Amino acid sequence: MWVLQALAIMLSIQAGVLDLVEVPPVVRSLPVALPAPVNLPAVLPGSPGLNDPAKNRMLPPKRPGAPSRGGKCAPAARYFLSSDKLQAYLLSILPPQIEDMVKCDKVNMEGVLGDILATMQDSNLLSILDITSLLQGGGGLGLGGLLGKEGNEDPSKPSSGSKATGGLGQLLPEGLPGKEGLGGLLNLGGGKGSGKGLLNGDGLSNVVKPLDDIVENVDSLKAAVQDKVKSVVPENIKDPFSDLLNMDIQETMLKLKVKQVKVGSTDINMGADGIKVLSEVTADVEGEGLLGPVFTLLQFQSVMDVTMNIAVSSNNTQCVNLDVQDTHMHVKEMNIQLLQTVTETVPLPTSLPLNDIIPIVLTAKMNENLEKSDSCGIVLSDFNDCKNTTGLFGYQVHTARISPKGLSIDYCVKANIDNKTVPVPGGRLPPDPKNANVSITTASSALRTLVKYVAKQSSVQMNDLEAQITYIAFAPQENNMLRLLYKVDITKDSQPYATGETKLFISHASKILNSKLVPDVKLTRSEHSVVPPETKEEVEGIMAEVTRKAWSRFNELYKKMSIPDGVSSNTLTNSDVKLLRSNDLQAAS
């Protein structure tokens, strides 16, 4: 019957007939099941759009930018840094920076948490503490021991006098005076005298003295425990335990401060799209002003993940750096730890019923504060000092890329000879040495550019003879030797007269010390031949002068030879420069 009446009411509303200011008696009599009120704040600070499910998850990282590319030249040099060395650098530099970021004033983790707790001003301690786990924790030394509720005891039954003394009773060694009065002091059993022992003062004076003796004689029991225990039993409070459990949160949390941040583990994944970092972090936020019988400290411990993407950037210069992108803090849980000091400090993690809300608000607000801050972010400025260097060869970044093997930087190369800039042709570079941490490779075209320039500058005139190098080539030999071959056209009175051929054998023992090339080349021997042979005696002098001039010029320029800067935090400190079969130069460590 009432269903039909309700239907009639709905139709009347649609027709605009019924005035809803006065509720009809039929509706007033309908049974309604109301849920029990929940003592939670309606609006949490700094959490706009909290009900948006998309904001309750970790923010997806932005896609890293494409590898940095320079001009259209073909690379003629490469610097390589292995993934092991790169990860070692990140593992040494990231954890302290992550800790500083979480503790940063502008991220304001403690302030955000304080604002959340401040909204619970109508709540008491029981509304946020999972009191069941407290009553079961600590082996009778927590609130369960003090209230006579052991972990396996039915909380609906009256507590027994013997178990009621278990908590503080374990604090008093056998034989100390006053221990026998503890049962009277904490007579919280279900009998008629429940609670009277605490208020009539019997045994109270006998407990304070033993507590003083414990603090003095047992190193593991801190003085703060005694002070907190005393504060529970002031004479003017009739029910101190009730007052403790119903203490207003704002009275207990006078101040919040991030005391310690610790990075537990850091995983680094290197791929073609950059470096992905995941760090597990715990942050302890301490509160001052808590009154408790056996606990000296109330800690809020946040467990979070810090993620970031790291890409390479060069801005088309000779320097490459690491750019930290998409730093994100994801608070997974917020625990309360009650640190108990008896023989040692024992953390008792206590879950928050609000664990589904507090981490979400902290995550959103802390990331918002981090994004607004200009001083809390992670900057890897010491990865590369990016100094402008000069030398015989100039290097400009062509491509910088990250791969599972490590960081590779390819360079365009130009030779700066006699105030002239000569592009160095690029080509296919040899692979990086196996198991190398750091390596530098310079294409054979760099040495060829140098040799060709020397050949053009080695013309000689002597009496009526003139010699000019018309062909030059070089090839590697055993034991890091270099054979340089060149041909000379010799004219007499401007007419072709003879053709000479010279082979120079050069030892190569150059090194890279502290990222600088230390040249060491020596001319060990030379061989000459002339066509026609009958002109040999006449042209020997001019051919020797060509050799002297060419070698002098080559040696002078080679000593000015420079190498790519690479990364200043990972350089070659003492490495031999090897001449490969491909005529490329390579050094590694």
Curated annotation (Swiss-Prot):
Coiled coil: none annotated. Residues 49-71, 146-170 are annotated as: Disordered. Residues 1-29 form the signal peptide. It is found in: Secreted. GO terms for biological process: sensory perception of smell. The keyword Signal applies. N-glycosylated. The N-glycans consist mainly of complex sialylated and fucosylated biantennary structures. Abundant in the lateral nasal glands. Also present in the posterior septal and vomeronasal glands. PANTHER family: BPI FOLD CONTAINING FAMILY B, MEMBER 9B-RELATED, BPI FOLD-CONTAINING FAMILY B, MEMBER 9B-RELATED. This is Vomeromodulin.
